C-alpha cells in the first residue's frame, strides 16, 4: 500500500511512521480517540494505558490532546515499540513504553484511570474477508485470534482491570463488529457498568466503552 511504501501515514492531524511491524492506523481508530476525548475532562490529571500500542498512534494523540495526561503504552513486539518510540519523539510527547504481553503482564502498583486497546480480534476464519494488502503487509500478530477463543485479549484486560484500573475508571476498545454483543456481554457480566457499544461511520458496532464499578 501507499503508506507502507512511504513508511509514513497521517492520523488525527499528525504524521506517523509505519512499517511491516505495525498496523496502519485506520479511520475507525480516529473515531475511538475522538470518543475518548469527548468523554474525558482534558484539563484534569489522568493516567492512561494503551494496550497493544503498535505505531503508538492512540497513546501519542492522547498525550498531545490531554495536557496533564500521564500516558503508558504496552506492546509485546520489540520492533513495534521501536517505531512507537520514534513516533513519540517526532510528535514531541512523553510516553512511557512497556514491552510485555497483556496475557502475561502483572503489576500490583500501577493504576490507570483509562485503559484503551485495539487488540487482535479478527478470527482466523475471517481471513478470507481481508484485503490482500492487509494480509501481505501488516503484522498477523496484531490482527488475528483463534476461532475458539476470539475474546482472549478482552478477557485478559478484564482480569488486569481488577487491580490496575481505578474505581470509576473507564475502558475503551475497538471490537469485532461480528462479536459486538458477545463482547458487550463479557463486560456486563463482570464488575463493569454503563457498557456502551458505538457505531463507526459505516454504522457498524466497532467500539465499546465501560466503567468500572
Segment roles from a protein language model:
Residues 17, 61, 75, 142, ...:
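Conserved beta-strand segments that form the floor/walls of ligand-binding pockets within enzyme
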Residues 147-211:
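Conserved Class I SAM-dependent methyltransferase catalytic core
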Residues 28-129, 156:
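Conserved SAM/SAH cofactor-binding pocket of Class I
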Residues 67-69, 210-213:
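Extracellular beta-rich repeat passengers
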Residues 1-38:
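Conserved AdoMet
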Residues 121-153:
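Mobile active-site "lid"/loop adjacent to the S-adenosyl-L-methionine
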Residues 15, 70, 94-96, 193-196:
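Conserved beta-strand segments of alpha/beta enzyme cores
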Amino acid at each position: 500500500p501507499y503508506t507502507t511504501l512511504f513508511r509514513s501515514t497521517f492520523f488525527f492531524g499528525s504524521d506517523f511512521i509505519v512499517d511491516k511491524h505495525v498496523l496502519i492506523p485506520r479511520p475507525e481508530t480516529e473515531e475511538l480517540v475522538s470518543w475518548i476525548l469527548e468523554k474525558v475532562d482534558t484539563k484534569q490529571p489522568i493516567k492512561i494505558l494503551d494496550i497493544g500500542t503498535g505505531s503508538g498512534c492512540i497513546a501519542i494523540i492522547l498525550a498531545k490532546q490531554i495536557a496533564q495526561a500521564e500516558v503508558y503504552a504496552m506492546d509485546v513486539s520489540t520492533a513495534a515499540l521501536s517505531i512507537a518510540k520514534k513516533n513519540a519523539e517526532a510528535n514531541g510527547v512523553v510516553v512511557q513504553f512497556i514491552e510485555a504481553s497483556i496475557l502475561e503482564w502483572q503489576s500490583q502498583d500501577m493504576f490507570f484511570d483509562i485503559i484503551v486497546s485495539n487488540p487482535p480480534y479478527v478470527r482466523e476464519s475471517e481471513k478470507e474477508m481481508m484485503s490482500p494488502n492487509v494480509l501481505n503487509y501488516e503484522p498477523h500478530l496484531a490482527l488475528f485470534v483463534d476461532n475458539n477463543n476470539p475474546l482472549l485479549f478482552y478477557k485478559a484486560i478484564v482480569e488486569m482491570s481488577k487491580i490496575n484500573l481505578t474505581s470509576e475508571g473507564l475502558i475503551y476498545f475497538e471490537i469485532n463488529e461480528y462479536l459486538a454483543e458477545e463482547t458487550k456481554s463479557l463486560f456486563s457480566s463482570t464488575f463493569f457498568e454503563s457498557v456502551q457499544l458505538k457505531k463507526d461511520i459505516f454504522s457498524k458496532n466497532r467500539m465499546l466503552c465501560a466503567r468500572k464499578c
